[in-house]
Amino acid sequence: GLVYTFTLRDGVKFHNGNDVTCEDVKYSLERAAGLLDGTPLVATLQTIQSVDILDDKTVQVTVDTPNTELIYSFVTAIIPAGSGEDAEANPVGTGPFSFVSYTPQEGIVLAKNENYWQEGLPYLDEVDFKIVGSADTALLELQGGSIDIYAYLTDSQANELKDSFNVISSPSNVVQALFLNNDYEPLS
C-alpha cells in the first residue's frame, strides 16, 4: 500500500517517564527517512513522502511507491521529538531495558525499564552485553562463567557444550522476512 495508519498504544512511556506522543513518532520516522536533513538513517524508509498526525493517537504515513520491506522497517526506534544528536550520547527509548552505560570495546549495560508498557516484563533487573573479540574467546568466557548466553555457536562448539550447558538449537537460515504483495487491493 501507499498509506499506512498507526494507532499508538495507551500507557507507553519513554525511559525518562514521558509519554510517547504522535509528535515523537512523526519526528522519529521523518528523521529515519531523511525528511529532516536529507540523510536517511534507514534505507527502506526513504520511500516515505509524509508523516501526518491525524489525532492524538493516530499517525498516517504516506510512501511514494509500494515496498514489501516497509512494514519491517517500522521497527525503527521511536525517540523523543527533537532529541536528535542527544539520542546518540544519551539514548532514550521505550523498550524493556533502558541505557545505563557504554564502554567502547567492552560492552553496554542496560537496566530494567520500570515504565515498560507490558505488565510483568522485563523480569530481569539488568542486562550486560559484553563485546568479545572472537567466537573462541566467547566460548571460553561461557565455560568460565563470565557470560551467561552466547547466541552464535558453531556446530562443533554446540557439541562441545551440550553435556554441561543447556544448548538450544533450531534450524535457521538467519533470514526473517514478511513480504506483502502490493499489486492487489487492499495493499496497492
Which ranges hold each PLM region?
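Aromatic- and charge-enriched surface segment that lines or borders ligand/interaction sites
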Residues: G1-G38, Q60, S188
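Extracytoplasmic
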Residues: G1-V3, V20, Q46, L54-D56, ...
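Surface-exposed binding/hinge segments that line
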Residues: T5-T7, L41-S83, S101-T103
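Sec-exported extracytoplasmic/periplasmic mature domains
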Residues: K13, E30-D37, N115, Q143-I147, ...
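Solvent-exposed, polar/charged alpha-helical surfaces in well-ordered, non-transmembrane soluble domains
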Residues: N18, E23-R31, Y72, D125, ...
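Alpha-helical secondary-structure segments
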Residues: T21-S28, T58-T62, G95-P96, L124-E126, ...
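Extracellular/periplasmic solute-recognition and catalytic clefts
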Residues: S50-V51, V100-V109, D128-P186
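Gly/Pro-rich hinge or "lid" segments in bacterial periplasmic/extracellular proteins
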Residues: Y72-D128, D136
